[in-house]
From Swiss-Prot:
<dbReference type="GO" id="GO:0006493">
    <property type="term" value="P:protein O-linked glycosylation"/>
</dbReference>
<dbReference type="GO" id="GO:0046354">
    <property type="term" value="P:mannan biosynthetic process"/>
</dbReference>
<keyword id="KW-0808">Transferase</keyword>
<feature type="glycosylation site" description="N-linked (GlcNAc...) asparagine">
    <location>
        <position position="38"/>
    </location>
</feature>
<keyword id="KW-0325">Glycoprotein</keyword>
<keyword id="KW-0735">Signal-anchor</keyword>
<keyword id="KW-0472">Membrane</keyword>
<feature type="glycosylation site" description="N-linked (GlcNAc...) asparagine">
    <location>
        <position position="247"/>
    </location>
</feature>
<keyword id="KW-0328">Glycosyltransferase</keyword>
<dbReference type="InterPro" id="IPR029044">
    <property type="entry name" value="Nucleotide-diphossugar_trans"/>
</dbReference>
<feature type="topological domain" description="Lumenal">
    <location>
        <begin position="35"/>
        <end position="828"/>
    </location>
</feature>
<feature type="compositionally biased region" description="Polar residues">
    <location>
        <begin position="86"/>
        <end position="103"/>
    </location>
</feature>
<dbReference type="Pfam" id="PF11051">
    <property type="entry name" value="Mannosyl_trans3"/>
</dbReference>
<comment type="function">
    <text>Responsible for addition of the terminal mannose residues to the outer chain of core N-linked polysaccharides and to O-linked mannotriose. Implicated in late Golgi modifications.</text>
</comment>
<dbReference type="InterPro" id="IPR022751">
    <property type="entry name" value="Alpha_mannosyltransferase"/>
</dbReference>
<feature type="glycosylation site" description="N-linked (GlcNAc...) asparagine">
    <location>
        <position position="437"/>
    </location>
</feature>
<keyword id="KW-0333">Golgi apparatus</keyword>
């Protein structure tokens, strides 16, 4: 009996303890949700949470002034900021000037290190291989004011972090703006970063300066260069000059880091969240914050810190900058970050002459079902997000199409491209994007090429007719399919103060941003497609990543290491990653040949892009193009496309694995014998056209420089080129030579040369030492010869042989190339 009572009482105790434990867990969960996760009673403003605690009496503006010296706490805090952060009110509306780093770097904080490791693991990036981590200077101010980093990372939700970042920009300078016209930001000489290079490059200049200085100090003394060449005083003078150069350069680079960081964080905070190929209904920002709160709580409990998370308390100055619609609407930030925008839409003009002032709905004009694209990201009736012009622009874009950026100078090749697109049975609309003006004559030529009856095709069609659908030549509809043409005038989208900033290559980025498609293929006017546009839209890698890029020739032009370091610095910092979930650069980007020293990496004559997945990167492209130190390190626009994505924290871009090939007809072996009259092991193909070969099946998908054998005929000096007679030996007369240049390129073969930046394939067998050789004697300098093998035995017996790839196109492919070439050139 006693045993039964004991067992019964034990069970009762277990039940009671269990109830108490469950009750305590519920209380803790309630506290976590209502205390730790919400550090104060917050007032909702649109889509952001105000950092001001309305229950905190100290937040009442009537109780104190930030200028009241008798308020000891406030006065000392302000004094501390003024001492540590100089030039707090900039007078030139430019970005914050670099300040000295905090004495105790916040990057060394254990919480930040653990959170970053966790993020890298989630992103399948176990090792950080970067050599530089450069953050926006404003973080120094934020973490000096809030040295207990856990109060930010363990308390503030995503919107509150955004507010905190931009509040501090206003505290630093109420007139801050991303000044893209700052001409002081420049690259003095990218090859001078090492002291010895700098000294060698400027030695004579410094001798003159030093001599002038000495004459001013000692006017009666005759000074010769030999008197001071090796003097300590002169060496110190050079070191001083180098230090000045270095400090100027670091200042300019930090301004660019600040500008790109602010842009990146604004886009992350206030633009509609971008889709991925595997978009779910999860709110990524909320998931990121919830996960981080749990980790911060776990870190505090596991460490010697007080497990109770301190409450976040904004500084008095932060409380003065209140983001609400009546005081400081966050949409004002859009004007500060994008001062070059007029916040108007482009002018959209259909081929009929009808004009629209907002993006057209393409499904109303092209009714084949290809224009009914579904938005993966939506406003969800959020008036806050819709207050931003850039969000409205993104949401109004729709459908799929082709985009060209041209001027009147490009009308001839544009007409030829449109003829080719008709031959390729293209059904996608085409938008011609221009800046400022496109003449009436140019528009007439383009519309005529797109809409005229085109039922007569070259004789070469007979050999390929079987490869096209039965309705390919539908005479009732005007033969080859007519094209839906739109002209997009982007001049009015640029603020009047910045119109001169958009010339040349910048137009391509305007075309990227302001065409009206969700998905598009951006083309150069002289690009030649050998596959239909639908081929590119259906590439699996494009569907997965929202991009498809192609590589350039591997011409062994190199860049200094300082270039790679510079672009690394522009990427997201660790604190960007931890605060805003913007991933740092990984080996996916940093192991590319560009970062190892290759100068030409991407070819941008054909780019496939998805706006819904990469919109913020489009904006980063435009911003990067403003900076002279960026443009001085690349050729034209091409590298900015993929670099902008990596710098924006978006590394879901894709390159075809093949580098560009030379396409055409291989040089007969007998025409390039060795000095002893024996044949080379290597094969040679000389062509003015780089072509792009699919890694998947070795098919030719597109090529550059039009379809004339030589795309530079207006510049060619035919008499001089014909006299060389070292190539094209089958052409016996000047007239035949000239006719050949104006004929379509005939494509039978392609060569993708080998490439290894670490190997110069010198050899003793008269084989080429590098994969590409530019021959300036032909096609006005546009002739390049490619070799499938380079290197061989050296005098020491070493073998430097590297092998590339030869592609021999079958009869069907050659017949199609001939037909497309005849259409492009206009042959009967």
């Amino acid at each position: 009996m006693i045993e039964k009572l004991t067992i019964k009482r034990s069970r009762q105790k277990v039940i009671a303890y269990s109830v108490i434990i469950i009750w305590l867990m519920i209380v803790n969960i309630w506290l976590l949700n209502n205390y730790h996760l919400n550090s104060s009673t917050l007032t909702r403003h649109g889509n952001g949470d105000n950092l001001i605690d309305e229950d905190d009496d100290s937040s009442s503006s009537s109780e104190y002034s930030i200028y009241n010296e008798l308020d000891t706490e406030n006065y000392l805090g302000q004094q501390h900021q003024e001492e540590d952060v100089p030039n707090s009110q900039s007078t030139d509306n430019s970005l914050i000037k670099p300040t000295s780093p905090a004495k105790n770097s916040f990057k060394d904080d254990i919480t930040i290190k653990i959170l970053q490791k966790h993020l890298q693991k989630q992103q399948n990036n176990p090792k950080d291989i970067r050599t530089k981590d450069s953050h926006a200077e404003i973080y120094n101010q934020i973490f000096e004011n809030h040295p207990q980093i856990d109060t930010i990372l363990g308390n503030l939700n995503f919107n509150q972090r955004c507010q905190l970042f931009f509040q501090n920009l206003f505290i630093k300078d109420n007139n801050w703006i991303l000044n893209v016209k700052d001409k002081k930001i420049k690259l003095e000489n990218k090859n001078d970063f090492k002291f010895n290079d700098f000294k060698k490059s400027h030695l004579n200049e410094f001798k003159r300066q030093f001599k002038t200085m000495k004459k001013l100090l000692e006017p009666n003394k005759i000074i010769h260069n030999k008197d001071f060449d090796n003097s300590i005083e002169f060496q110190d003078f050079i070191k001083m000059k180098y230090e000045q150069f270095w400090n100027r350069t670091m200042t300019y680079e930090q301004k660019i880091v600040d500008s790109i960081s602010i842009l990146r964080i604004f886009n992350k905070c206030y633009l509609i969240e971008e889709a991925t190929s595997t978009t779910t209904t999860k709110n990524n920002k909320q998931d990121f914050i919830k996960d981080q709160f749990k980790l911060v709580d776990g870190i505090r409990r596991a460490s010697k810190k007080n497990p109770s998370l301190p409450k976040f308390k904004p500084t008095k100055q932060e409380q003065m900058v209140n983001f609400d619609n009546e005081n400081l609407s966050p949409s004002i930030l859009e004007h500060r970050v994008y001062p070059w925008l007029s916040f108007e839409y482009p002018v959209y003009e259909r081929w009929t002459g009808k004009v629209q002032y907002q993006p057209p709905k393409m499904a109303n004009y092209v009714k084949d079902g290809n224009q009914k694209t579904t938005k993966k990201t939506k406003y969800n009736n959020d008036k806050y997000l819709s207050s931003f012009f850039l969000n409205r622009l993104k949401q109004k874009c729709n459908g799929r199409g082709l985009v060209l950026s041209i001027s009147d100078l490009h009308v001839d090749v544009t007409v030829r491209l449109i003829h080719l697109l008709r031959a390729l049975n293209n059904r996608y609309p085409i938008q011609i994007v221009y800046y400022d003006n496109l003449s009436k004559e140019t528009k007439e030529k383009i519309v005529t090429a797109a809409r005229e009856v085109m039922s007569h095709v070259p004789k070469s069609f007979e050999r390929v007719a079987k490869y096209f659908p039965d309705d390919y030549l539908d005479n009732d509809q005007g033969g080859l399919p007519k094209q839906e043409i739109w002209f997009i005038n982007t001049y009015n989208v640029i603020h009047a103060d910045y119109k001169l900033q958009f010339r040349g290559f910048a137009n391509k980025f305007l075309a990227t941003l302001f065409n009206s498609f969700d998905e598009f293929i951006l083309l150069d006017a002289d690009t030649v497609l050998t596959q239909s546009p639908s081929y590119f839209f259906n590439l699996p890698q494009y569907l997965e990543t929202g991009t498809f890029f192609y590589k350039d020739r591997t011409t062994y032009e190199t860049r200094p290491k300082s270039d790679s370091i510079f672009f690394e610095k522009l990427g997201p910092s660790v604190i960007d990653s931890v605060m805003f979930n913007i991933p740092i650069m990984t080996s996916y980007t940093l192991n590319r040949s560009f970062f190892k020293g290759l100068f030409h990496y991407m070819e941008s004559g054909l780019v496939v892009l998805n706006r819904d997945m990469h919109y913020s990167s489009f904006l980063t492209m435009v911003q990067m193009n403003f900076f002279e130190p960026v443009n001085s390190r690349i050729h034209g626009d091409k590298e900015i496309f993929w670099l902008a994505m990596a710098i924006n924290g978006k590394q879901n871009y894709y390159f075809d694995e093949n580098y560009a090939a030379a396409v055409g007809v291989m040089t007969p072996d007998i025409e390039r014998t060795k000095p002893d009259k024996t044949l080379h092991e290597s094969k040679e193909l000389c062509s003015p056209h780089p072509g792009h070969i699919s890694h998947d099946d070795n098919s030719l998908v597109w090529l550059n420089s039009g379809f004339f054998y030589c795309g530079q005929n207006d510049k060619v000096k035919f008499v001089e080129e014909f006299k060389h007679k070292s190539r094209l030996k089958h052409l016996n007369t000047l007239e035949a030579f000239k006719t050949f240049y104006y004929s379509p390129l005939r494509i039978e073969n392609a060569i993708i040369p080998p490439m290894d930046l670490d190997i110069w394939a010198a050899n003793n067998e008269d084989e080429p030492a590098k994969g590409w050789f530019g021959d300036p004697r032909y096609c006005s300098g546009y002739m390049w010869c490619a070799y499938d093998k380079i290197g061989g035995k050296t005098k020491s017996g070493k073998n430097t042989r590297l092998e590339g790839k030869i592609i021999n196109f079958d009869e069907q492919a050659q017949d199609l190339f001939n037909y497309y070439g005849d259409v492009w050139v206009g042959m009967e």
